């Protein structure tokens, strides 16, 4: 599951850097961090991982990805303001 998380994080970071306005950035946030976003969908799948070590690793990757995306959003928001 970690490659999927990395892919979703990369897509979100790319979309954030391409956002030209604050409104565009808000759409990116909803698309990637919202309830129906890519990262949220992957997070729901964490419980289905049977191996505790794999689940722990995927959870850590999910946390790191979400943190990176949130930090990038804040940085981009400051740039656009």
Regions found by a protein language model. Give the residues of each.
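N-terminal alpha-helical targeting/anchoring segments
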Residues: 1-81
